[in-house]
Amino acid sequence: MVKAATRVRKKVKKNVAEGIAHVHASFNNTIVTITDRQGNALSWATSGGAGFKGSRKSTPFAAQVAAEQAGRAAQEYGVKNLEVRIKGPGPGRESAVRALNAAGFKITSISDVTPVPHNGCRPPKKRRI
């Protein structure tokens, strides 16, 4: 029995002029997600996915490489303007924003959206080295 050939539709890339770059900088990793205005993800990259493993993931350079990768993928959608939202205390905060700026995006605003507890969960104990 021969199957009828199914037509393969080419995925149409939507053209988005402005987006939002969400930078989640934890102490162990940095995640950069570029979304449209509604919050639908266009591209994302992590410092672990950029080839860094272990303690090198948490460096500013790894965050810079991850932001460059996410930026290159977002430029295929026609993103020109970015609003940057930074979350977390990690070391890759500033370098990710600098990398997006150097990638040719016009950054309209930078906001810190780090969640601050109203005395919620107990924080992790201090490290003794």
From Swiss-Prot:
Give the source's domain of life in one word.
Bacteria
Q: Name one Pfam family in it.
A: Ribosomal_S11
**Entry-linked PROSITE patterns:** RIBOSOMAL_S11
Its Gene Ontology cellular component terms are: ribonucleoprotein complex; ribosome
Q: Tell whether Nucleus is among the UniProt keywords.
A: no
Q: What are the GO MF terms of this UniProt record?
A: rRNA binding; structural constituent of ribosome
Q: Does the keyword S-adenosyl-L-methionine apply?
A: no
Note the InterPro entries from the entry: Ribosomal_uS11, Ribosomal_uS11_bac-type, Ribosomal_uS11_CS, Ribosomal_uS11_sf
Q: What's a GO biological-process term for it? A: translation
Keywords (A to Z) from UniProt: Ribonucleoprotein, Ribosomal protein, RNA-binding, rRNA-binding
Family per similarity comment: Belongs to the universal ribosomal protein uS11 family.
User: Cross-referenced NCBIfam families, in alphabetical order?
Assistant: PRK05309.1, uS11_bact
Q: What does this protein do?
A: Located on the platform of the 30S subunit, it bridges several disparate RNA helices of the 16S rRNA. Forms part of the Shine-Dalgarno cleft in the 70S ribosome.
- Assembly and binders: Part of the 30S ribosomal subunit. Interacts with proteins S7 and S18. Binds to IF-3.
- In Swiss-Prot or TrEMBL terms, this protein is called Small ribosomal subunit protein uS11
- Source organism per entry reads Nitrosospira multiformis (strain ATCC 25196 / NCIMB 11849 / C 71)
